[in-house]
Amino acid sequence: MKNTSKFQNVVIVTIVGWLVLFVFLPNLMIIGTSFLTRDDASFVKMVFTLDNYARLLDPLYFEVLLHSLNMALIATLSCLVLGYPFAWFLAKLPEKIRPLLLFLLIVPFWTNSLIRIYGLKIFLSTKGYLNEFLLWLGVIDTPIRIMFTPSAVIIGLVYILLPFMVMPLYSSIEKLDKPLLEAARDLGASKMQTFIRIIIPLTMPGIVAGCLLVMLPAMGLFYVSDLMGGAKNLLIGNVIKVQFLNIRDWPFGAATSITLTIVMGLMLLIYWRASRLLNKKVSDISD
């Protein structure tokens, strides 16, 4: 018992130390930097200021933030529309086939997402495989311009983040109470009524979790908007990257990062509140 207790203490101390060293302290440094002044010589001057946060109210940066939220929302809804039928199909397959498809769903994670975006860029370019194929079929007369548009950014975000939507949806659909669905049909409910009144409420925790897993990173994937959207389709992540790497305005970049973190934190809070209400509703439906 003593050895087990000592081992547990070592594990707890290790985890806490790791969180403090790699999460708490870096975030504390970013928060501190956001209240300092830019200096051309040393990047940061130890002079307190609130100007970095005031600059975020500038219409230019505020518009980028709203644009990021809009793009993330569209990408999330697109992933939900594409991911739900796939997750449903996956959950209804024989158990012998499911592991293979789940494995194929995870395989893309073995390749760096940046490399995959480069591949997608080649595929969708004016002289890419998609346009060449459509021209060969005679569907189009001239190549379609897809790259460097908002649609290209959405396609890139969906391409990268779709598995994050499918996984929680699959988990929720797989746990559906089959006798409950059969009872609804026996009582005369149509397939659409069963789907809207039974299936959607029961899988809502997976829907909310999937939307959160997609929407949060979608706002910060700056390389997707860089490669697929160009300079006219910036996300808030691009602003942070430019401030740190190009302009070297670390305090303003830190302030932008903290603002994005606060927005994500509010989304997590909404998710926590919604998940509690949904779990209660699901238990009521099951009862």
From Swiss-Prot:
Main location: membrane
Periplasmic membrane side: 32-70, 121-145, 219-251
Pfam families the UniProt entry points to: BPD_transp_1 (PF00528)
Gene Ontology cellular component annotations, sorted alphabetically: plasma membrane
The ABC transmembrane type-1 domain, residue ranges: 65-271
Subcellular location: Cell inner membrane
Regions of this protein lying in the Cytoplasmic compartment: 1-10, 92-99, 167-197, 273-287
Gene Ontology biological process terms from the UniProt entry: transmembrane transport
Membrane topology (UniProt): Multi-pass membrane protein
Gene3D superfamilies the record matches: MetI-like
Keyword tRNA processing recorded: no
Keyword Membrane recorded: yes
Keyword terms of this UniProt record: Cell inner membrane, Cell membrane, Membrane, Transmembrane, Transmembrane helix, Transport
Residues annotated as transmembrane: 11-31, 71-91, 100-120, 146-166, 198-218, 252-272
Alphabetical list of PANTHER family matching this protein: INNER MEMBRANE ABC TRANSPORTER PERMEASE PROTEIN YDCU-RELATED, INNER MEMBRANE ABC TRANSPORTER PERMEASE PROTEIN YDCU-RELATED-RELATED
Function summary: Required for the activity of the bacterial periplasmic transport system of putrescine and spermidine.
Family, per entry: Belongs to the binding-protein-dependent transport system permease family. CysTW subfamily.
Name by which UniProt lists this protein: Spermidine/putrescine transport system permease protein PotB
Organism name: Salmonella typhimurium (strain LT2 / SGSC1412 / ATCC 700720)
Gene: potB
